[in-house]
Amino acid sequence: MSLELTTPMTNSPLVQRVKEVHEQARLLATLDAAARNGALEQVACALEEAREEILAANAADCEQAKANQLNASLYARLELSPSKLAAAIAGVRQVAALPDPLGQRQLHRELDTGLILSRVTCPLGVLGVIFEARPDAVVQIASLAIKSGNGAILKGGQEASRSCQTIMQTIHRGLEKSAVPAGAIALLTQRSEISELLQLDQWVDLIIPRGSNEFVRYIQNNTRIPVLGHADGLCHLYVDRAADLEKAIAITLDAKTQYPAACNAIETLLVHRDIAEAFLPKVAAALQQAGVELRGDAIACDLVPMSLASEADWATEYCDLILAIKVVPDLDAALDHIATYGSGHTEAIVTEDAAAAARFLQEVDAAGVFHNCSTRFADGFRYGFGAEVGISTHKLPPRGPVGLEGLVTYKYQLVGNGHIVATYSGANARPFTHRDLDC
């Protein structure tokens, strides 16, 4: 995909909508925590009241998706079960219960008597969130945007159009009973609007794409607006020579089969050669019973009947019940493989060797590095963030699951009493005190 970046028409319907969100976001940013939390409770109540309406809209989307032969991983994201919707609603209330991310003083310093510097958190402004399927993302993103004082413009995939529109209408009904302006949260419905939205860097402060590798790379390559997200979720699980094999089997099954379409599901299993003969037949039987197709290197294929993996398999994010397996001679080889093929998302080791675990945790370069637990824990809700807008694999923060802290920035506030720089310059310059104060 490619897109020529051009100056948008200032009078287009989309530009007018985005400008309206920008203006309403300015009002939202002035509201106190009680007002924003009250709005979230109204949204949660509205979603509960509209539960059947939302599920019916999603059922219609799913029926259409089946007719259109939507691929399995996208369909898994699209389907909104009663429990998934209930979890999304619970997430709204959990976000409301989190500490206020705004107005937090991170630095408080006296530069001189009567000249006080503060660094205080504030909203980013307007978020543009573009996602494939995932109707529950509308709930998550709207709640995080409201809590963090940001406006939000959402664009879901066409496959989820009924679900997203019904959810957004419900959110607006809740906001109309609150102090938060409903116009601060908007939903786009036309695919053609994406390319224009990506050009609106004057009014949109951050783009958050959620979807396939190709989709995220398209967004990253076609906008001047900062992009938060990850294009790949190629996660590994390394089973060390000192692993508890029962733990390793349970963790492997969970990390691959609990939700194979998730970006934090493993795609490659690395096994130390010293335990491969004892471990691989057992884990392969469990995986195959769960419907997983196995693709292994020559050593793995000698131990267990499976397809021979190609070079491409080590670099593939399947998002499906497919797992590549490689037998490695030692921890160094596992680290090298991860460094070569990993996407910087989440990597895990299973071992009872504390030194090996410590080295893995220290040396692997990823947003999440785990010991003796499933990669599926890489999630904002499970981390206690309430919800997440996405996962970032960038080196600069925010990194990993992005919740409220990743949706605020800060400003420096300096309060004086007629102070001027000339006082602190020249031969008789007055010295700064630079005394830290309590925050």
Swiss-Prot record:
The keyword DNA damage does not apply. One of its GO terms (molecular function) is NADP binding. CDD domains: ALDH_F18-19_ProA-GPR. It is found in: Cytoplasm. Keywords: Amino-acid biosynthesis, Cytoplasm, NADP, Oxidoreductase, Proline biosynthesis. It catalyses: L-glutamate 5-semialdehyde + phosphate + NADP(+) = L-glutamyl 5-phosphate + NADPH + H(+). GO terms for cellular component: cytoplasm. Pathway: Amino-acid biosynthesis; L-proline biosynthesis; L-glutamate 5-semialdehyde from L-glutamate: step 2/2. GO terms for biological process: L-proline biosynthetic process. Its main location: cytoplasm. Its EC number is 1.2.1.41. It comes from the Bacteria. Catalyzes the NADPH-dependent reduction of L-glutamate 5-phosphate into L-glutamate 5-semialdehyde and phosphate. The product spontaneously undergoes cyclization to form 1-pyrroline-5-carboxylate. Belongs to the gamma-glutamyl phosphate reductase family. This is Gamma-glutamyl phosphate reductase. It comes from Thermosynechococcus vestitus (strain NIES-2133 / IAM M-273 / BP-1). The gene is proA.
